[in-house]
Curated annotation (Swiss-Prot):
Belongs to the DegT/DnrJ/EryC1 family. ArnB subfamily. Its cofactor is pyridoxal 5'-phosphate. It comes from Serratia proteamaculans (strain 568). The lineage of its organism: Bacteria, Pseudomonadati, Pseudomonadota, Gammaproteobacteria, Enterobacterales. Keywords: Aminotransferase, Antibiotic resistance, Lipid A biosynthesis, Lipid biosynthesis, Lipid metabolism, Lipopolysaccharide biosynthesis, Pyridoxal phosphate, Transferase. InterPro entries: ArnB_NH2Trfase, DegT/StrS_aminotransferase, PyrdxlP-dep_Trfase, PyrdxlP-dep_Trfase_major, PyrdxlP-dep_Trfase_small. The gene is arnB. One of its GO terms (biological process) is lipid A biosynthetic process. Its EC number is 2.6.1.87. This is UDP-4-amino-4-deoxy-L-arabinose--oxoglutarate aminotransferase. Gene3D superfamilies: Aspartate Aminotransferase, domain 1, Type I PLP-dependent aspartate aminotransferase-like (Major domain).
Amino acid sequence: MDQFLPFSRPAIGDEEISAVEKVLRSGWITTGPQNQQLESEFCATFGCKHAIAVCSATAGMHITLMALNIGPGDEVITPSQTWVSTLNMIELLGATPVMIDVDRDTLMVSASDVEAAITTKTKVIVPVHYAGAPLQMDALREVAKRHNLPLIEDAAHAVGARYNGEWVGARGTAIFSFHAIKNLTCAEGGLIATDDDQLADRLRCLKFHGLAVDAFDRQQLGRKPQAEVVEPGYKYNLSDIHAAIAVVQLARLPQLNARRKALAQRYLTALEGSPFLPLGLPDYPHDHAWHLFMVRVDAERCGIDRDQLMERLKEMGIGTGLHFRAAHTQKFYRDRYPQLSLPNTEWNSARLCTLPLFPDMTDADVDRVVKALSSVVESLRVSR
């Protein structure tokens, strides 16, 4: 049998290993100069005014919602077709997530659906860039401006994506993930990009105990050692070990994303006319980051359902993923919002299957996956 092919694998090389070794030998391994370099180079790369590195995108979402004073009685509009962390943060702050449906093919929210969900209790809109494709930001910004609401982009999937020629994160506020499977990874980490000066100041405070400065500021930059807690905060800072990896990955991102794009195009060409339905591409100008390559497995079209296909592929040495089971179908949210019906979300949630896609894959790996999909379909035809 061929070697097992996972659905994702981090593209870590000698440069990342050397960067980590350098930090370990430096005597300063927690938040410090590598964080500062990461934030500075992220701003230079994507044109954002402020970049605040954090230990995860979830942490970034938490303190961003906190900084906007989200709490009991407030509503936050966001899709259910996303990872549950955003919904969890909204709930943990005592607010109510208003989950809306997504486009059946792109899995992203529309400005019209967002606007229809706005009430007097709405305090923030959190749309999600999906699988590497950017949202149609102009229309969403118009809705947010019309109703005087902050717009916080969940850009966990979208580092290196562009909408209408503009990098995701270049303006407004966007939250990125550097988790192990992301296009830019440092194992665990995240970053908040914003052009709001006051928000940036509060985020830096909230991410580190509510202190105005961190340990590196105090010990290395000669700032006042008696830092004061100005409000209760969290321990959401990123270590320099992680930041050093992210700095290298940021420099490599154009090449890493280009390889993802080439692999995705190979999939799209090979799967044309097959019963497996890739996600639709946005019909507006964009540059796709190809974080994930997903197909929808409809039992009527394919002769097999999603879960059965994933098991068959596993037996053939091919890993797959599910991104994601809709949040409102999870037990906590199902019990809490039993009447919620989101047809497009539910249709996709039952059929989504993530196929292997990572920069170190070969063209032959893609061909192997496509051949496996074809053989499953053919075996079902023969057995009928």
